[in-house]
Amino acid sequence: MADAGLDPAPPVLGEDATAVACLFRGLADPTRLMIVRHLARGEHRVVDLVAHLGLAQSTVSGHLACMRDCGLVTSRAQGRASVYSLARPELLDLLLAAQAYLDAVGERR
């Protein structure tokens, strides 16, 4: 029996659960969150992200591939380089909501 005072489950938890899980998998790594932070400032080549993050090119490329597969970033060719950008600006709203949630519950890990 459903509680009369509770709102029904948001539709995001229904048929789109797989897509939502993929979205959060794409964000579930501190390095990927740092990549989002850099891409929020504008497009970056892989070599630029490597320099900013201090990681191997293969590591950064692997994270970008995961993020691309999850629909978080897009890429375009620029000569022999790939230039990455955030797929949608709403991603930043999601991260702000996550920060607000963490602030509300006082969780820091």
What residue ranges belong to the model's regions?
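Amphipathic alpha-helical dimerization/coiled-coil segments
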Residues: M1-A19, R88-R109
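N-terminal helix-turn-helix DNA-binding core of bacterial DNA-binding proteins
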Residues: G14-T59, G71, Q78, S82-L91
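Residues within the DNA-recognition helix of helix-turn-helix
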Residues: H63
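Short hinge/loop at the helix->beta-strand junction immediately C-terminal to the helix-turn-helix recognition helix
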Residues: C66, G71-L72
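Low-complexity, flexible helical/coil segments
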Residues: L72-S75, R109
